[in-house]
Amino acid sequence: MGTGDFICISMTGGAPWGFRLQGGKEEKQPLQVAKIRSQSKASDSGLCVGDEVVSINGNPCADLTYPEVIKLMESITDSLHLLIKRPTSGTSEALDSETENTNHQHLPHGGPMESTTLQIQHAAKTQGKDFLLASVQTSAPRTEDQGNAWGYAECTTEDQVSQMPGSQEGHLVEEVILRKKPEAGQPGHVVELQLSLSKERQRCTSDPIVTLLGNEKFKSPDPDWGTQHGRTVHINSIPAPEKADTSLTSGTTVQTSSGRELTVIQGRDPGGTGLPQVEVILDCSDRLKAEECRLQAGRGCVASPVEGGRSEAPPSLVSFAVSSEGTEQGEDQRSGKDQGRPHKHRARHARLRRSESLSEKQVKEAKSKCKSIALLLTDAPNPNSKGVLMFKKRRRRARKYTLVSYGTGELEREEEEEDQEAGDKDEISDLAFLGTSESEVDEELLSDVDDNTQVVNFDWDSGLVDIEKRLNRGDKMEMLPDTTGKGALMFAKRRERMEQFTAQNEEEKTGGLAGGGSDALQTDGLRTMTSYQRKEESVRMQSSVSESSFQMGRSLGSVPQQNGFSGVSETAGPQRMIPMNRTAKPFLGSVNQTAAPFSPTQSVTSPIPDFPAPPPYSAVSPPPEAFSRGISSPVAGPAQPPPWPQPAPWSQPAFYDSSEQIASRDERIAVPAKRTGILQEAKRRGTTKPMFTFKETKVSPNPELLSLLQNAEGKRGTGAGGDSGPEEDYLSLGAEACNFMQSSAKQKTPPPVAPKPAVKTSSSSQPVAPVSPVWSPGVAPAQGPAFSTTNPPNPPQVTAVSSIKIAQPTCPPARPASALNLAGPFKGPQAAVVSHNYTPKPSAPTPLVNAAPAGAGGPSNELPGMSGKGAQLFAKRQSRMEKYVVDSDTVQAHTVRAQSPTPSLPASWKYSSNVRAPPPVAYNPIHSPSYPLAAIKSQPPGAQASKTSKKKGKKPLNTLDVMKHQPYQLNASLFTFQPPDSKDGLPQKSTVKVSSVAPAMKQALPPRQADIGSPTNAKASSVYSVPAYTSQPNFFAEATSPVSASPVPVSVPTSPKQETTSTSYFVAPRPKFSAKKSGVTVQENWRSLSLPGRAAPPIMSAPPWLCQPAYSYSSKPTLEQEKANKRPTPWEAAAKSPLGLVDEAFRPRNIEESIVANVVSAARRKVFAGSQEDWKERLSFVPQTQKTSMSFSERREYNVPSPVNSHVSSHSLYSSQLPYVCYRKESRNDLKAMSMDTRSEYCLPLGGYDYNPHPRGWRHQP
């Protein structure tokens, strides 16, 4: 072609176009491109320097001057179409793309398309051809006009990127439709071609993209060709097959991804014009491709349903190049360009698109755009570009999670593609690692895993490796015929695990409870491991909670104590989820186990530790007789079920143990495991007893106690019921709520925790304030209703109790049960003993006033089966509060005496921060039985001192690091508030009966002298038989006087062990501290004391009445002395001392005090000079000797010299005392230790008979 190649270049987007023109008519030079800016639209479109511009947007440029051209260019705002003439040296290789692609499903459809119409007009006067360009949409069928003579050339472009079998480069797809429109009636034919043009070739326009040579005729036009333009497939230029016909050698063979070929061959058509032909070989498979090419090439042309076959055209050579800009802009710009082309063309295209609606146009445009974008992503020019990699990653993820097969991540290939791959492709074994994570590495590995690869699926969560072989068609998993993929495997595994766990749980439920303590430990470990797998189990367990609880109850009864838990060890393991008072454990089990008489109670008791019984302070307390009987008989029948209602199922460990068990990470994520630990426990507590874990025996609950637990009003009712209500209320608020319990409590009577001076007055004025001693609630809860239930029916022990019984049953004990319950809470025989001691006879009911205070105090001290951190903290804090709420008189009276937590030890030694830690048993003074009873609310003098110390308490706590975790305990230990009278009055051996005695004393208290004299009171004191050293009996008496003014008759177990228990209880009557102290002290006491009943003492802890100091009768003289000789409170002393010592608070203030201290010390040395046995006996009697001047309550205590009762009472009095007692027990014989004890005792300036030379700490525990 002598004139060169004509190229149509389209640019869109508006100026600047990026090229400069030169020449023009005035210069008599053709208009040429002088310069092209790099990376500009002109450069991208393939415009080259030196190209001659024939027309601009259809306006011929031959007659235009340069200014006119510039003006014309400036008028173009959107799209620029240039027809340029480029010299060429010959024919160029042809690139053509077939529009029909049977595998078009794999390729994105639609995309921006730009259509340009090139009209080639033959003019007689010119050898060249004029080209008119206009935008046209190619979506409309164009083959309708294929029969038109002399058509026009229409060039359509669209951006598409496809995955070429052997190509990494992106290709610009152009639909180039060449149509020649007739002019002046000249005949002609229309040739339509769809071309795929690579961007590289576009830029190198010197090498023409498409070369059409010769006449071609469409024999079989496809009327729907326009609708199939989306099927365009990208092609790669390849050399003509060697096996192709020789006629192909003169042309170029182009193979598309679908296996089609476009060949441009030199041939002769029938007219002999010597024009080339264009052939398209369709649907050539790998095997038949050569044959078909050969055959079709031999024929010279092939009927193409897409291309329309062969047609003739006037001889011409036209090369088309389309800019990339045009392809990017898409149809948006050509949709409105119809006005730019000749009217005849618009009319024609309007006719073609008449059937299209606007929505259809939009849909097609969107498709074309999407196709163009998708092609760019799937066959990007730079496959390593960030955008392409991201797209692939997202695509893999989408495939992985959009399949129906639970997310295997394997994309099922199309049948056609599989057929192709199955052809000549060798099978390749690839390993793709499919994990559960979403990491990029996993996704990369997952990318495009073919069906013929082996997929190794690692389920890292389950730790199992599942190998899934996927060959050509992808083998389905045998194990899961219906579903496939990682998800299916995960669910199958989960099913198996859940079945295993269910079977294990069933086995454990049926026979697991019979194991020993070691088994329990193992159970704990297993439970920890499988805590996250409890989902299904919890529901089932809830339904079976009652059953399991009964089973546990039986097992508890039968199982020997372990870890200090009697019979509970078996169930304790499963139940350990519920925090328990570890310190109290030994008391619970060992004491119960040791005391033969308590064995019946043991079975009940052991369940009690595990399942906190409802507040022992039930509305109805069993008769003291029953308690005494149960306690007195060492070999009692099997423990009766606790009278209180059984704890809610949540309190039972089994309930929690059978928790759901979730197997894998995915499962855990989908179904969060049940919360465990403190949070779970708190949730269980819910609204009922949030701070306490009440482990109830599986025995049928006592209807009365059950009503107390279930009825909030009943709990808040007068007497013990009040204890339960406030307890729950404040527990729900938290441990600190106990500080406000007294004020917030809605009890009709003041809570035992904070006996008011008025209460004290009432006690002194009304001998019959049979309200359970404030301490009794604490004691009773410690005991647990089990004892009350077991013992109440037995009136025989009333004799023992009778001594304790208060002669003034002014009013039936509103909740005497509180006292009984106090004894009941003790899990062991001691607990039973305590209950007996504290249980007032029905005949001598305690006044509601006492019961109410007891109830108030009970929450902290009286919680029956209270265990766990929450219960401990609450009890400790409440006791601390009570200590500070003591009547001012009582506090003062008791502050007068040395405030040593362990009377046996000197205050300095006891309070030394260093010393505190060493005594394992009495590490916490508050927990020790020696803990000053005066510290409890009952002491009026203690109240003042406690208030003072309360203000300063936090400082001393800071100073004393040892107790930093339990500052409140430390506070209690610092205050050995015990009126001298109560000290003297309480014999060491006084038994738990002291609780009864205290009420009796309080009844007589109004006339304190009379109380002392009253035989009943004396008898009660005997029952108390608190060790002489224990001033606490006095405190109990005092404390009892206001609240327990009407002493609750307490049956004291006659068994020596019971005595010991009661004694310990009596010794450590700290109603406020009973819960915490009893727990801690109990352990200590248990160690020091071999009594099995110690476990119970922790529950009994300090009976409120015991804890309360003797009232004014014993403390008045002390009060006066104390006022006269005011010494710093233990808190003040600790605050002043750099070491936190409180010696200053206990040192003699004057000569009188010094003399008294010396005398007391000497007396003690004499008393304790003998062996422990002698010493024990002396202790039991010494208080009597000293009690001559002591208060009636003290005298009563002394009156009960029975070593057994004394022992039990001392034991039960205050389990917390036991630790100290035990500790001192070793040093009791030691003069030095005794001197220390005396030091704490004598430091109190108690010249009066109220002074108790034998502190609790001195009491000897057998």
From Swiss-Prot:
SUPFAM superfamilies assigned to the protein according to its UniProt record, in alphabetical order: PDZ domain-like
Region Disordered: start-end pairs: 89-114, 239-276, 323-363, 503-576, 592-703, 741-799, 833-868, 933-957
Ranges of biased composition (kind: Pro residues): 609-625, 639-650
Region (Interaction with FLNC): 808-1153
In-chain residues carrying the UniProt-annotated modification Phosphothreonine: T327, T605, T749
Compositional bias annotation for Basic residues: 342-352
Amino acid composition bias (Polar residues), ranges on this chain: 89-105, 246-260, 558-569, 592-606, 786-799
Entry note about domains: The PPPY motif interacts with the WW domain 1 of BAG3.
Protein name per the record: Synaptopodin-2
Organism: Rattus norvegicus (Rat)
